[in-house]
């Protein structure tokens, strides 16, 4: 019969082994590819979020995020600029300049703006600038405009990245963009924001994912899954893997282990679930994958995409 100390060690080990998944410590470092930071108390205020959004309209800075993210295994984050004000790109670059936790930012520029080339070249000279995000409708307009196409080509020529946000139709736009600019790295934001009712995903979305992922220069974020679950009608406090499994299976079968990344969409993501719940979903899904595949999705692919 084991002595008392050995028995205590066995019980402690067993308890850790059989804890529910959400109580387990993180098993791999996370490079969060999607956070927003802003300060409504600035003299000029902010264009987003609006004052009517009481949960978001507050000062949100990196130190606030680090307090809750680091204990979950987050080692750094890519900031996504939500403000359309050109100078807010510089505000973020200044915020990130001396912070090793923030290896890169994705700005917000309009390729149909007359001063776009000037703005892009200016920001591209700064070490942490990696490109900009655009919504689906504006990208469509740019692709239909001669100057817009030239400006997107400039983005590619400078070795920068394009992130695209919107609903499932954005996947068709991404397909066209990837065909026209095969050297431009493109990131689908929030898995194309398909409302998830916990059943089989919409055919439009599934077909779009297959089309977009057929281009090696296109990556996709596992992000806003909890938000999509809420949009699809989920009412529980904790969004479980089973509710999102079908969506994750499509993403995995489309992009594989080398072109998926993880993003929290913090602080917006907290409207749908806790930061822990947000990261628990891909963690649980990837439990059956190899250690190399888990590292790829949680940090390695982001390092390759953003060059950090």
Q: Locations of the language-model features?
A:
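Catalytic pocket-lining loop regions of alpha/beta-barrel enzymes
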Residues: 141-261
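Mid-to-C-terminal alpha-helical segments outside catalytic/metal-binding sites
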Residues: 2-33, 53, 58-76, 249-250, ...
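Short aromatic-enriched loop/helix-cap "lid" or pocket-rim segments at secondary-structure transitions
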Residues: 41-46, 118-119, 199-201, 232-234, ...
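Active-site metal-binding loops of divalent metal-dependent hydrolases
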Residues: 35, 82, 191, 265-266
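Residue-level preference for long, well-ordered alpha-helices that form the structural scaffold
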Residues: 54-58, 88, 144, 201, ...
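Short, small-residue-enriched loops and turns at beta-alpha junctions
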Residues: 84-85, 112-114, 138-142, 194-197, ...
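Mid-domain alpha/beta scaffold segments of enzyme catalytic cores
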Residues: 24-158, 164, 168, 242, ...
